[in-house]
Amino acid sequence: MMIWKRHLTLAELNATSQNTMVAHLGIVYTRLGDDVLEAEMPVDSRTHQPFGLLHGGASAALAETLGSMAGFLLTRDGQCVVGTELNATHHRPVSQGKVRGVCQPLHLGRQSQSWEIVVFDEQGRRCCTCRLGTAVIG
């Protein structure tokens, strides 16, 4: 069963990223399912740390991007969602290619939400697990 209250296409979701950090990092929404939102991000000079690996902050940015947009899709007119807490556990390095973030709800309350975002490499291996808490305002 679809949980989203706002009904946007992937093209509309991606258009919201124009001229933002999301676009600068190359993050692209790729799937909007009944209760899941996915995006891809390149692992290249924009997202590397100085030693040629995916920067943990880039993984966190992907996670917060997904969780915040998922939270927004659950709001009604006059409401917004803001992040309150982000936790990231890094499991394995990635040096090139793309990573895919998969965002699903853990808790959906009237005033707060919790999201799990798992980042996978191109071989489908879990690279990072994040949890984002959000507050619903309005």
From Swiss-Prot:
Single GO molecular function: 1,4-dihydroxy-2-naphthoyl-CoA thioesterase activity
| Protein EC | 3.1.2.-
Summarize the protein's role: Required for optimal enterobactin synthesis. Acts as a proofreading enzyme that prevents EntB misacylation by hydrolyzing the thioester bound existing between EntB and wrongly charged molecules.
Q: Name one GO cellular component term.
A: cytosol
Subunit relationships: Homotetramer. Dimer of dimers. Interacts specifically with the aryl carrier protein (ArCP) domain of EntB.
NCBIfam families associated with the record: PRK10254.1 (NF007607), unchar_dom_1 (TIGR00369)
**Matches recorded under CDD domains:** PaaI_thioesterase (cd03443)
The GO biological-process annotations, alphabetized, read as:
enterobactin biosynthetic process
Keywords for the protein's UniProt record, in alphabetical order: Cytoplasm, Hydrolase
Main enzyme class:
hydrolase
The UniProt family comment states:
Belongs to the thioesterase PaaI family.
InterPro entries xrefs: HotDog_dom_sf, PAAI_dom, Thioesterase_EntH, Thioestr_dom
Where this protein primarily resides, as one coarse class?
Answer: cytoplasm
This protein is called what?
Proofreading thioesterase EntH
Q: Where found?
A: Cytoplasm
Active site per the UniProt annotation: E64 (nucleophile or proton acceptor)
The keyword Amino-acid biosynthesis belongs to this UniProt entry's keyword annotation: no
Pathway assigned in UniProt:
Siderophore biosynthesis; enterobactin biosynthesis
Write the gene name: entH
Q: Lineage, please?
A: Bacteria, Pseudomonadati, Pseudomonadota, Gammaproteobacteria, Enterobacterales
